[in-house]
Curated annotation (Swiss-Prot):
Signal peptide: none annotated. One of its GO terms (biological process) is cell division. GO terms for cellular component: cytoplasm. Gene3D superfamilies: 6.10.250.660. Pfam families: DivIVA. Residues 34-71 form a coiled coil. The gene is gpsB. This is Cell cycle protein GpsB. It comes from Geobacillus kaustophilus (strain HTA426). It is found in: Cytoplasm. Forms polymers through the coiled coil domains. Interacts with PBP1, MreC and EzrA. Belongs to the GpsB family.
Length: 98
């Protein structure tokens, strides 16, 4: 997977307690900022989950496409030439008999 593992979850951030000191930070301001961080974490986690699902789906699709027999250019060209020949016979063959 990735080299960096996420160490915090939104729940960890929400439940984090800070010691109060005489000249500490404004608790309401810290709480509001932590709420923003939690929302970002949740959004990032949701996006990561969606991207992982899409990645897995695309990998399955690639595997399925690789399993299908590849149509060679020679076979395709032969088919086109055969169709063209049949068409010429159909179109020009009628004119010969008219």
């Amino acid at each position: 997977m990735s080299a960096h593992q996420v160490k915090l979850t939104p729940k960890d951030i929400l439940e984090k307690e800070f010691k109060v000191s005489i000249r500490g930070y404004n608790q309401d301001e810290v709480d509001q900022f932590l709420d923003l961080i939690i929302k970002d974490y949740e959004a990032f986690q949701q996006e990561i989950d969606e991207l992982r699902q899409e990645n897995a789906r695309l990998k399955r699709q690639v595997e399925e496409l690789q399993k299908r027999p590849a149509m060679s250019a020679g076979t395709t060209n032969y088919d086109i030439l055969q169709r063209l020949s049949n068409l010429e016979k159909h179109v020009f063959g009628r004119k010969l008999y008219e």
